[in-house]
Amino acid sequence: MKFGETFTEYLHGEEEWFLEKCRFVEYKKLKKVLKKCKTCNSTKSDDGQIIPSATSSSLSDSCECKACPWCDQMFFEELMKEATDIAGFFRSRVRHLLHLHVATGMQRYMIRLRRCFTDEKQALVQEGQILIQYITMNAIAIRKILKKYDKVHSSENGKNFKLKMRAERIELLHSPWLIELGAFYLNSGLDNVGNFKNSFGRVACENLNEDQPVLKLMLPNSIELEYDLTCAICLETVFNPYALKCGHIFCNSCACSAASVLIFQGIKAAPRHSKCPICREAGVYAEAVHMIELHLLLKTRSKEYWKERMMNERSEMVKQSKMFWNEQTKHMIGY
């Protein structure tokens, strides 16, 4: 079965009720745009519209032109909008799902009360399954259509567009929220996601107490993702991790140190000109994501290490707080 048929079957399958309220890649529409692209063998009408020539039907669909303004305007503009909407929807739904899982205070009490009447945990797990399938199928659709674009135009514009998506932080399978979703499954005791009614792959966390801790996601369609859980600053397993806007993950204390802010002030107090220690991109601290599920995973899977790091961070935080307020006192009273 071709991917177009598989994608259509997915859109009209069991999750159709969910997909009706969210954006997805218009795979067939974009494919039709590529099929109509005969730029090298077309003429222009009097009003400037592109019309395929009579001889174009005898030629192959492959276009030798490196640039195709008509196709590019319709194709990349639409695809960028779709990818942005998909990434935004995925981010908002995962954030809502995880907020329910780690809720505190009165909201936590109300959720526990609801669980007396409904299986709330099962509902969260089911939505997580749907979101994994949603992001995976759309990521495959984007990859397939960009590959087809490069084949039709004999160019590398599709590859360049993927790099642009990564720069714009909308590459679907490189989202910190996907890591959080994987950690959520492990925290729920579901090391094998395929235990449910559909095959959604596997999630595994390996070598937590060794030199190279990793989180592995084996998604549908044989997609394997591996995320390094080593902080690039302290070279240890990330503790109280934050993902910067650029996607790099650091310990909270390490990121604060790199941005020249105190731990108790928080990572989002970093100046706008602060740069990522790895890629050196500025302005990545303001939209940092607190990886709460990943932090809980490390707390349960590596208890001794977590306790040691917690004591060290608290000690350093108290030390920094004392120094800060001593300096403030001296500044106020003059000595």
Swiss-Prot record:
Q: What is this protein called?
A: Probable E3 ubiquitin-protein ligase BAH1-like
Q: Which family does it belong to?
A: Belongs to the RING-type zinc finger family.
Q: Name one GO biological process term.
A: protein ubiquitination
Q: What's in the domain note?
A: The RING-type zinc finger domain mediates binding to an E2 ubiquitin-conjugating enzyme.
Q: Which GO terms describe its molecular function?
A: catalytic activity, acting on a protein; transferase activity; zinc ion binding
Q: What class of enzyme is it?
A: transferase
Q: Where are the zinc fingers (RING-type)?
A: 231-280
Record's Gene3D superfamilies? Answer: Zinc/RING finger domain, C3HC4 (zinc finger)
This protein's pathway reads: Protein modification; protein ubiquitination
UniProt keywords (A-Z) are: Metal-binding, Transferase, Ubl conjugation pathway, Zinc, Zinc-finger
| Enzyme Commission designation | 2.3.2.27
Reactions mediated catalytically: S-ubiquitinyl-[E2 ubiquitin-conjugating enzyme]-L-cysteine + [acceptor protein]-L-lysine = [E2 ubiquitin-conjugating enzyme]-L-cysteine + N(6)-ubiquitinyl-[acceptor protein]-L-lysine
Source organism (scientific name): Arabidopsis thaliana
Entries under SMART domains matching the protein:
RING (SM00184)
